[in-house]
């Protein structure tokens, strides 16, 4: 199964490691990449690149991310994200627009989501 890697997982994996052991999510991402199952969507790409201040690091990350195929985002994904948002709110669950768009794209395209963001566990109780 192809895997949509969320910004939170990428951020942990891309963080410079000094003395601490490498986080498990980094090994998961490496395995997903090795297997050719990693996909990305524009909003995740934007979030990752928006956090880079140094122009050289920005360019390096942009070039690395270009290796991963973009999963298209359809009009129906935005509509489903809005539906999921409304369902979540009715259950007292708040979600960001990007998170719920990730859920919608994953549902339509039958993608797994790799994330360290615990909010996705709450979304899963609704969708």
Q: What are the functions of these language-model segments?
A:
Residues 6-7, 48, 81, 106:
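Generic structural signal for small/hydrophobic residues in well-ordered secondary structure
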Residues 68-116:
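Active-site neighborhoods of divalent-metal-dependent phosphate/nucleic-acid chemistry enzymes
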Residues 1, 30, 103, 107-127:
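Acidic, PIN/NYN-like endoribonuclease modules and their adjacent C-terminal/linker elements
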Residues 10-11, 45-48, 120-121:
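A generic structural signal for short hydrophobic patches within well-formed alpha-helices
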Residues 1-40, 50-63:
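Short, well-structured N-terminal submotif of metal-dependent ribonuclease cores
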Residues 26, 41, 45, 58-61, ...:
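A general structural signal for well-ordered alpha-helical segments in protein cores
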Residues 34-36, 64-68, 91, 109, ...:
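Structured helix-beta-strand junction loops
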